[in-house]
Curated annotation (Swiss-Prot):
GO terms for molecular function: 2-hydroxyglutarate dehydrogenase activity; L-malate dehydrogenase (quinone) activity. Its EC number is 1.1.5.4. The keyword Repeat does not apply. Gene3D superfamilies: D-Amino Acid Oxidase, subunit A, domain 2, FAD/NAD(P)-binding domain. Signal peptide: none annotated. It catalyses: (S)-malate + a quinone = a quinol + oxaloacetate. The gene is mqo. Keywords: FAD, Flavoprotein, Oxidoreductase, Tricarboxylic acid cycle. It comes from the Bacteria. Pathway: Carbohydrate metabolism; tricarboxylic acid cycle; oxaloacetate from (S)-malate (quinone route): step 1/1. Disulfide bonds: none annotated. HAMAP family: MQO (MF_00212). This is Probable malate:quinone oxidoreductase. Its cofactor is FAD. It comes from Pseudarthrobacter chlorophenolicus (strain ATCC 700700 / DSM 12829 / CIP 107037 / JCM 12360 / KCTC 9906 / NCIMB 13794 / A6) (Arthrobacter chlorophenolicus).
Amino acid sequence: MTFISKTQHADVVLIGGGIMSATLGAFLKQLEPNWTISLFERLDQPGLESSDPWNNAGTGHAALCELNYSPAAKDGSVSPAKALLINEQFQLSRQFWSHLVDGNLIGSPKGFINTVPHMSFVIGDDHTRFLKTRYEALKPHTLFRSMEYSEDHGQIAKWAPLIVKGRNAQQKVAATRAAEGTDVDFGALTRELTTYLGNNGVEINYGHDVTGISKASDGGWDLTLKHPRSGEHGRIHAKFVFVGAGGGALHLLQASGIPESKGYGGFPVSGQFFRCTDETIAAQHSAKVYGQASVGAPPMSVPHLDTRYVNGKRSLLFGPYAGFSTNFLKNGSYLDLPLSIRPGNIIPMLAVAKDNMDLTAYLIKEVAKRHGDKVEALREYYPEAKDGDWELITAGQRVQIIKKDPQKGGILQFGTEVIAGRDGSIGALLGASPGASTAVPIMIELLQKTFPKNFKGWQGKLKDMMPGYGVKLDENPELAAELERATAKSLQLESVSASN
């Protein structure tokens, strides 16, 4: 019996079976149904790394509650620009998922997306002033028109009882709430997308490592494959390659040798969460409650107490507690970081180490935290939390981008970045948050960079799939409201009224 893929040629090879590759594959099947596509995933199922529901927080990132997307300037003002951009991006994701559901291309949306109000919650006078300023900056905008603000313990308790019960009634607190927020199981969505691909002619290969990549004489790429369990080896030629292997993308991008990959490095940050599966406790909390990050903390370390829906069951999640591991993947190797160091990226990496002492100090402090300290951090958001109701789980790895900078030598960049070869034959995605929630606009950006000639001809189809494509919804309130209603109906999102 042969385990290794025997396919010799493909128009497109997708490396990695996470939400990014699955999304790109779904786009290509819609835009170019006759193209041959092969997907290779090193694990035995799709979406088991960063896309897995317990490896990420599952927040449908729309900047409704994440304070790091709209930080205070030195003068105390808050710019809404980044929050607006992220919200616009998430609206595109909602529209694409709705298109797939409406066309019966994927299964019930209840399996991957549910309504969960998004809240920001802060403690103390300074943080309260900031939150009110943020609310006043966002509220006038179409995409944030439903946002509510309160400093009243009683009102906040109606929104999220667990964060108020047992709290000192004199403590200064403030919260905002957006009732239309969502919780997304990106693992379930990834499985739906890969099932759709497999049912429509895409060759899906699990348990396959892509061990090498080299430029072919015809402008395409030759990839070497290994099936670790059987020890078999294989090869495949592709006209186009997408490296969507999460934390594993950097190594393959470096192996490609394209000039655009030079100077990039990765900084891995691991994380842990507390999880509560007690249904009586979970039933008392229906919100994703985001707070303020500690000084020096990376953006993905903002503390939050979340309602989660995984496999139809409701549970609670709190964290993350950051840590450090040299792995680039949860199922990776401790050698991932040292083996990623190249002559072209060592200077940017050293510059980042020098300029980010706050982050280093934060990670050392987090790694040294005892279990009791972690429980106390939970009680800042859930005062009556009992240690025995929560289990500590390890989340997925987040590899932040290190890149060259003409002034500093190198910078640590939070977020995601599309890297594309000049000839359009290869594309890759590096980075993390907001990540999965913006998979749709990120893959559209990749398509534009790697298929510029085809992209012009795809405009009509993209508009059919996503009626808000190419439109700033924040500047078109009627269309924004119409699409919000339509996507909520398609995705079977329950309406949660304000002030409840």
